[in-house]
Amino acid sequence: MMQTPFHKFFLLAMLSYSLLQGGHAADISMPPGIYDGTTLTAPFPYTVIGDPRGTKVTSSGSLELKNLDNSIATLPLSCFGNLLGNFTIAGRGHSLVFENIRTSTNGAALSNHAPSGLFVIEAFDELSLLNCNSLVSVVPQTGGTTTSVPSNGTIYSRTDLVLRDIKKVSFYSNLVSGDGGAIDAQSLMVNGIEKLCTFQENVAQSDGGACQVTKTFSAVGNKVPLSFLGNVAGNKGGGVAAVKDGQGAGGATDLSVNFANNTAVEFEGNSARIGGGIYSDGNISFLGNAKTVFLSNVASPIYVDPAAAGGQPPADKDNYGDGGAIFCKNDTNIGEVSFKDEGVVFFSKNIAAGKGGAIYAKKLTISDCGPVQFLGNVANDGGAIYLVDQGELSLSADRGDIIFDGNLKRMATQGAATVHDVMVASNAISMATGGQITTLRAKEGRRILFNDPIEMANGQPVIQTLTVNEGEGYTGDIVFAKGDNVLYSSIELSQGRIILREQTKLLVNSLTQTGGSVHMEGGSTLDFAVTTPPAANSMALTNVHFSLASLLKNNGVTNPPTNPPVQVSSPAVIGNTAAGTVTISGPIFFEDLDETAYDNNQWLGADQTIDVLQLHLGANPPANAPTDLTLGNESSKYGYQGSWTLQWEPDPANPPQNNSYMLKASWTKTGYNPGPERVASLVSNSLWGSILDVRSAHSAIQASIDGRAYCRGIWISGISNFFYHDQDALGQGYRHISGGYSIGANSYFGSSMFGLAFTETFGRSKDYVVCRSNDHTCVGSVYLSTRQALCGSCLFGDAFVRASYGFGNQHMKTSYTFAEESNVRWDNNCVVGEVGAGLPIMLAASKLYLNELRPFVQAEFAYAEHESFTERGDQAREFKSGHLMNLSIPVGVKFDRCSSKHPNKYSFMGAYICDAYRSISGTETTLLSHKETWTTDAFHLARHGVMVRGSMYASLTGNIEVYGHGKYEYRDASRGYGLSIGSKIRF
């Protein structure tokens, strides 16, 4: 199997080393081929080179080495090794593959033992290492004893290692008895990988399941995801470990792990005793990566002292099981984990048997990132994040929300939830003694959401001031949604919102509000954290908002009210422990963010009195009764209308010396105003749609009458109609689109013409809120026109009359935002009658190229009505019948021109329209669940408008004529278009 070229490579390497001792760096060509240990007829020539001036090995073709084993040799070696100087392996676009390599020295595939210099692997199409093993070596000692020495790294470098400009890099199922299942180096730089970069199922019995470094790990500017999948370390760092006590250890300040400007960073299914994904004795930073994901990494088990004495416990036993995804701790300086300018950051289902389900660190900083999510991580303490003594936390939601949800920690107390017979409780962040939060802020439209609580341990030597939402543009939300949140800080709120969801507690040393607002839901508590020793704390609130829906629900109000109430009220609470003084001033606000509270019949359909706020002013020193408060906002303009009155009463559940008061709010109902989703203006506006469909039939009739004169004939026309009315203050608009056909027959009797027509249209309408409808309309028409000469052959008089009846079926769907969609059908009836007269004036053909000028005046009477009908379902409405009448008078002039060479005709008409009379009854609507009734009018079409119409006729034969007809009508806030194309057969 191509043995000779590789033996020549071995000889050339030795010769180059001997000849270049005093000259330039060696440049050696690597032979191509496949070298399979199972078929080689001679031992594989393991190659060791070294040149103080450096060595560059250049690939001359793709090379694959597999099934090689020198693990029990007297002198086990790597396939390629370097002893001195810089070492570079240049691929020149070829592949380098190692498979099933077995040895008992550092670097089963490649090793660099040079004490200084740089090891570079570059420019390969593919670098792949599969199933390579570096086993324990047995070293003889004096006295006939032996010592077992573990081997490190499938690729090993005593100095810095660089992997760059390689299209595909993969390390699969490699195993080492020491550190670095795939790579063990002083520092490692991975840069410019283009198509694949995967470290999968590598195992190190000590540290760094995939990679271990003793100084710096850096992955920068890679165009593909860096994937660390299912790697295992017996001690630290299932994926990556930066360890200060490794081979060639650097100082603690040299250590760091950095990922910057990569397409993606992925750690999934890695495991170790400490740091399931990453372990570092220095800082860890993520900067500018498009996506960073840590999923299902595990740090386990914790250290258990043996029952029998003997032996020394491991130095890091206290950290066993810490850092399910990331472990970062520096005993000398702050070990910081930072995420800056990241696209997406996602931690989910990571598990720590000890502390920090996702992250264990001394300092954590998240800033200028897109969405950041910690979901479903689990630990004994610090479900998502654990920060050690004197730790620091900085959270800034700049380009996306920061969310903690479903993270759990183990509990030893009763009453906690049970998962697989283990008592657990929600927990986002745990901070040990002396910790502080330095930044907590969210940009406008962003939020930091604690669906799991954050807890700080007592014992801060100096209480720090935390300014929430500090900085220009930080007016977002800090939301505490579950559990007991404890912040041993003096909180200052200058802008944005602090929100407490139902049954949530927020305990702080003090809170001063100079701006922004505090939002509380029913059952939430804002209280003082108990410090040791006790401190004189205070709260000063000036802008407090309450969720009305939550208060009503937690008060258990009903319609009609019950006495006693059906449940014990659960108002918001401020200052429950009486460990400080509380002042609250300025107006308070009732908020109905989803606009449902004022539309709930069970809540505000009757007069109510609810408990809003239980306020403990503090017992030391005694405080006066709270000042009267006013309501800063009125009730909603939709739903139930009424007024609130506020009143303080002593809290009967607490003794007077506690200075506890209850703020009660009394509601007096005065009426009901339906919201835009309730109104259903489409019902009454459908009457206009029926009139428009009949008018389109009349336009088709008018087009069939014009054209060349004939005795009798039949015609057919396709028609379309579009009408739009602007939205009103409620957002209610109207759009009607219909199309169909019209067919008719005309017959002349002297100077008079009589005709019949049938029209069928199919339409769609919507109100631009939540209603849309389909309709089907049938129209029957009869029409008569006459024309008489008044003065010779130039002046004539004509008149016409048209009458139509239309019957339409409407099918409306209402897509509520708060309830299921409803469907209902009803019928419309419509009658339209037109009369008109004109004064046709014949013109000489040379004048304005016109043949006829016809001033005219018309009168159109339209009447439409809809029947009574009732919806079904929880949101059912009953609609009474309604009608619409309109008298319209168009006045205008029509111009006709006939071609002098062809039997074609062109017609143009312009008219001013005045609606002289209109009556709209409106539709009486009843919301059955509320027993509330209102009347909805159809929109009032502007009384004045203009209309233009044009037609063109072309005779195909002496008996067949085709034509097109279009019209446009404009009124203030509305416009309509119509088009018809048809054909006539003359007899």
From Swiss-Prot:
Any single Gene Ontology cellular-component annotation: cell outer membrane
Gene3D superfamilies according to UniProt: Autotransporter beta-domain
PROSITE patterns, alphabetized: AUTOTRANSPORTER
Keywords: Cell outer membrane, Cell wall, Membrane, Secreted, Signal, Transmembrane, Transmembrane beta strand
UniProt cross-references to InterPro entries, sorted A to Z: Autotransporte_beta, Autotransporte_beta_dom_sf, Polymorphic_membr_middle, POMP_repeat
Topology in the lipid bilayer: Peripheral membrane protein
Broad class of where this protein is predominantly found: secreted
Signal peptide start-end: 1-25
Source organism superkingdom: Bacteria
Residue ranges annotated for the Autotransporter domain, each copy included: 707-987
Signal is among the record's keywords: yes
Cellular compartments annotated: Secreted, Cell wall; Cell outer membrane
Annotated family: Belongs to the PMP outer membrane protein family.
Protein name: Probable outer membrane protein PmpG
